[in-house]
Amino acid sequence: PGTGKTNTIVNTMVTAFFNEKTVLFASYNNHPIDGVCDKLKSIPYRNKGMIPFPIIRLGNDKCVLQALDDIRDLYKRTKDISIFDSTLEKNKDDKTRRTEKLTKLLQRHEERIELKEREEAILKMIETNQHLTFQTELQGVQLQEVRKKLAEIGEITDEEALKLVVEDEELFKKYLYYTSAKYIQRLKEPKNQDLMEIVNCPDEEKKVKQFNTYIRQEENLKKFQRIFPIIATTSISAHKIGEPGTYFDMVIMDEASKAT
């Protein structure tokens, strides 16, 4: 507890989504699953409310019923959002470039810290070895080299780094918002009509049973993953998803030592 495990899992899932990967998140207990799902469903974007992040929480029949209600609500929230694929691609490219720029800035910052530490160490050695001419001259040359590199790197202000972080976060949230909506809008596609019929079925017991049958079939699972690439469930209920086989690019297992 308190080690930031939930944030690490959330960041891993968001990165996987950005890279168009599918993820299965499983745990022995409900608590860590609910914690991660709640965080991913609570990312705000400007005045548009929460980002409709395409994660679905499955499990026992009660969880499945809630998932079907969530699918219906997400569809209502996103069906009228205008999506421009070319803009999304540009935003993704911009995000990638800004991340690279921020990475390079942080590398420069780390290198500068290391050089400043070396400069300080050399100055102390020169002060200690003033009576050793050869040693002092050698350290003087080293000091010049260090200071030359520091000059090449230049000053790096907190404001410069913070500006990149803030701009990068805003751009990323924009990308997440519209890309998430794009995924959810795939529910409109004719191939997903059978899923929408299950979602809109008025009989709760019947639609849970229908969905459990639906998600066991490989073809249906692959269609479902185009809408919800990130699926969370308990390790006990994971067997309900698809037939035996490989369906996910990544599997995150929390509390793995308790898994059976």
Label for each model-derived stretch:
Residues K5, I9, R216-Q217, T260:
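Amphipathic coiled-coil/heptad-repeat helices and related helical stalk/stem segments
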